[in-house]
Every structure is written in structure tokens, then in C-alpha cells.
């Protein structure tokens, strides 16, 4: 069994998937993961489909150097956004894998939430390119490791009403008693 950077609280209510040494840009995949972290699974898959069709965009926050601006970033409060199709394809495949794992465990796919998604850098794949005057430059790719965990949200328990009052001084107690006598 592979290790994840986060231990799930209740393994019976979570499903996970991971991909290692995926040949897709680390920076683009990092931004895609950040855009859907904490989202409902169905909502995230629909959003990624819309980004693939260029109807919405992925906001670029950290790795945003030399990136053009687009109005589609306004919904996220940013000006720099892109449509990284290859990274989206890898993330969609992992989400569908985790969804299949969740269905195998008997979890409800309508309520699943992306509770953890993390992108790490994999070792660079090195090639070379030949330049003028006999020089050679490095020509590297930046692959990624991706891991994600889907979980059913915890049921919210209603907070019990407070039965005891805060500390009351003797003067306040006397005043409350006097008001009760007057109203009775």
C-alpha cells in the first residue's frame, strides 16, 4: 500500500487515488489542484469540463509569471488565468479513479468532497537541444506526483442549548427576583 501525506480520519468514509511520475507540467497541475481543493466532486468535474471547453478558466495565483490576463479570472478575484488542458485531463482521470474506488466502498458519490489534493514535483526528465556555434542546452520536463482523497462530509450535530446561566452576582440575582415578583 502506498503512503499518502495525510492520514484519513475514517478510512471507511474516504476514497483515494494517486499518480506518480505523470508527464504533465508541475506548475499548471499545482494551480488546477488549488482551484478545486475542498469542492464537491460533481461540481469539480463539471468545472474542469467547462475549463476544457474554454467557458471558464483556472486562476493562476502562485505560478503566474509572464501569464496573460483574461476576464474569466474575475470570478476568483484574479486577472491571470489559463486553460491547462493536459493537466486537467490528468486530474480528471484521477478524480474518476477515486470516484470508482468510492463506489466500490459503497460511498455516496453525490456527497463526496475533495478533502485533500496535493501535487509534488517528480524528478526532471532530461533531454538536450542543440544550439548555434556547437553549444548544447538542457531541455527538461517537469513531471508531477498527484495524490487526492475524497471523503463524505461529517454529519453536523446541533449544538446543545446552554442550560446554566453565566455567573450572576448577588445584586443581579436580587434584581431578577424583583422583576419576577412584579410580573407575577
Swiss-Prot record:
Any single Pfam family the record assigns to this protein: Ribosomal_L22
GO function terms (MF aspect): structural constituent of ribosome
GO cellular component terms, A-Z: cytosolic large ribosomal subunit
Keyword Ribosomal protein: yes
CDD domains hit by this protein: Ribosomal_L22 (cd00336)
Keyword terms, alphabetized: Ribonucleoprotein, Ribosomal protein
GO biological process terms held by the UniProt record: cytoplasmic translation
InterPro entries in UniProt: Ribosomal_uL22, Ribosomal_uL22_CS, Ribosomal_uL22_euk/arc, Ribosomal_uL22_sf
PANTHER family found in the cross-reference section: 60S RIBOSOMAL PROTEIN L17
NCBIfam families listed in its UniProt record: uL22_arch_euk
Family: Belongs to the universal ribosomal protein uL22 family.
The name this protein goes by in its record: Large ribosomal subunit protein uL22
Organism: Yarrowia lipolytica (strain CLIB 122 / E 150)
